[in-house]
Amino acid sequence: TDITVNKDTLSEENKKIYQSYYCGLCQTMKSQYGRRAQMALNYDMTFLIVLLTGLYEPDSVTRDGFVCSVHPTKKRTLRTNEITEYAAAMNILLAYYNLIDDWKDDKSLPKKTYAEMLKKDFEKAKKGYPVQAKAIEDYIARLTECEKSNDTNIDAVAGLTGEMLGVLFAWKQDEWQTDLKEFGCYMGKFIYIMDAYEDCLLYTS
């Protein structure tokens, strides 16, 4: 389950602003980690950028008329700030750990190959944000144990996702840290429960 916006409820101007943050994240991942990193791009971290930007109001840089290789016929607007770089690093950490976990579960060779391609980028992001990297690593290990033991306490299992996301949402150790951790925790629990619900629908249909 990705955290995305309901575009039907947004004005055209707000759609463009949201897209500019998404494009800004994409290009930041390219500049910080290379083209291969762009394949790991997701909307979850765009949501985090919008959330933290609205809260902290950092100075942003806007670039109009940008044309990317994915959409060569459309001119885009890029919007970036210091939070964009943080979100790019979180995107890399999450992608790498998920790829490794999927490889262990499914023995998917393409995922293993992509994880190996991201290894250098992962090490760079991990060095910059060791606390967040440890939170994701611990989360996957604890979730794996719960799955192996067939833990049926969905609230407790969903709480693992919440704890991890809470750490990622708490960008700084400041007056917003507690609120952001709590928000991320509830968001993470909701995401896990919705994923479980979608899986139930898939297997029962």
What residue spans do the PLM features occupy?
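Conserved small/polar residues in nucleotide/adenosyl-binding loops
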Residues: 203-204
